Amino acid sequence: MSAAMMNKSVVLSKQCTKPAATPKVVTSKRSFASTVANKNREMMVWQPFNNKMFETFSFLPPLTDEQISKQVDYILANSWTPCLEFAASDQAYAGNENCIRMGPVASTYQDNRYWTMWKLPMFGCTDGSQVLSEIQACTNAFPDAYIRLVCFDANRQVQISGFLVHRPPSATDYRLPADRQV
């Protein structure tokens, strides 16, 4: 290596080892309470009793027909297949009594419980009103059952989403969003 090249590499290495400018640290005088999103000054405690949830959207108030129809439009826009399922109140939540177990091996379907399918999957469905009429028919047939809408992707052969569309009037395991915190 020539002397000129060595001098050049020494100069380059000195430039690379220069310390970076230290950023100025800014401290805030605000307390944690002033940064809470809901503008509350107190932390809330989640109500642990009678506050069960189901899949997607269960933290929201019950969906209206218009909101369900919009979700169906989204499902159809993604080429997924909507399907209705229902379950009695005592079979709706996961538990040892209603989980299907085959010896020490458990089924690979979600949480090892199956809901009953309402008719067949809606392969030919083109809009939300068709699903809403099926929800109404299922509700009329089983008024004291939980009903959920699930959607399947035929290409990936998986369930994509599922959400509750009907909660029985006799259900006592649910709280409105305003009552979920202590």
Curated annotation (Swiss-Prot):
Superkingdom of origin organism:
Eukaryota
Recorded hits in Pfam families, A to Z, give: RuBisCO_small
List UniProt keywords, sorted A-Z. Calvin cycle, Carbon dioxide fixation, Chloroplast, Photorespiration, Photosynthesis, Plastid, Transit peptide
GO CC terms for this protein? chloroplast
Q: Which GO terms describe its molecular function?
A: ribulose-bisphosphate carboxylase activity
User: Where does the record place it?
Assistant: Plastid, Chloroplast
Keyword Phosphoprotein annotated: no
Main localization of the protein? Answer: plastid
- What is a biological process (GO) this protein takes part in? photorespiration
Mark out the transit peptide: 1-41
Is Chloroplast tagged as a keyword?
yes
The family assignment reads:
Belongs to the RuBisCO small chain family.
User: What does the miscellaneous comment read?
Assistant: The basic functional RuBisCO is composed of a large chain homodimer in a 'head-to-tail' conformation. In form I RuBisCO this homodimer is arranged in a barrel-like tetramer with the small subunits forming a tetrameric 'cap' on each end of the 'barrel'.
According to its UniProt entry, what is the function of this protein? RuBisCO catalyzes two reactions: the carboxylation of D-ribulose 1,5-bisphosphate, the primary event in carbon dioxide fixation, as well as the oxidative fragmentation of the pentose substrate. Both reactions occur simultaneously and in competition at the same active site. Although the small subunit is not catalytic it is essential for maximal activity.
Tell me, how does this one assemble? Heterohexadecamer of 8 large and 8 small subunits.
UniProt name for this protein: Ribulose bisphosphate carboxylase small subunit, chloroplastic 4
Organismal lineage: Eukaryota, Viridiplantae, Chlorophyta, Ulvophyceae, TCBD clade
Give the gene name.
RBCS4
